[in-house]
Amino acid sequence: MTALSNMKCEACQADAPKVTDEELAELIRMIPDWGVQVRDGVMQLERVYKFKNFKLAMAFTNKLADLAEEEFHHPGIFTEWGKVTVTWWSHSIKGLHKNDFIMAAKTDQLLV
C-alpha cells in the first residue's frame, strides 16, 4: 500500500462512508503514534506532540495550519507550552474517513 503521507485527500461529502472496522485496524497500524478517541459519539484520531518550548510548539502549529489549508481538511488543534494536541476527524460524516489517516501521517511528516 502507498504510504499514507504520499496520498492526497479526496472531497468528503456527508454521505461518504466512514472507515469500516477492518479499514480502521489496517490504517491505524500505519500511524502507530496516534490513538482513537470517541467524543460525543464521534470517533477521532488524536496525538500529542511534545516540544522544548512554546515557540517550537507554535511553529509546528503554524506548519500544520498551512498543511490543513493545502489539503482543505482541518484538525482540532490545542497548543500550549511544550505541546500540541492534534485531533483529526471528518466533520461532515461525524467520524473517521481515510482522509483523517492521510492527514495524521502528513502531520507526522512535519517533524521530519
Curated annotation (Swiss-Prot):
An individual GO BP term: tetrahydrobiopterin biosynthetic process
GO terms assigned for molecular function: 4-alpha-hydroxytetrahydrobiopterin dehydratase activity
Domain of life: Bacteria
InterPro entries according to UniProt: PCD_sf, Pterin-4-alpha-carb_dehyd, Pterin_deHydtase
Catalytic activity: (4aS,6R)-4a-hydroxy-L-erythro-5,6,7,8-tetrahydrobiopterin = (6R)-L-erythro-6,7-dihydrobiopterin + H2O
Enzyme class: lyase
Swiss-Prot/TrEMBL keywords: Lyase
EC number, UniProt record: 4.2.1.96
Recorded family membership: Belongs to the pterin-4-alpha-carbinolamine dehydratase family.
PANTHER family: PTERIN-4-ALPHA-CARBINOLAMINE DEHYDRATASE-RELATED (PTHR42805:SF1)
Record's protein name: Putative pterin-4-alpha-carbinolamine dehydratase
The organism of origin for this protein: Shewanella baltica (strain OS185)
Origin organism lineage: Bacteria, Pseudomonadati, Pseudomonadota, Gammaproteobacteria, Alteromonadales
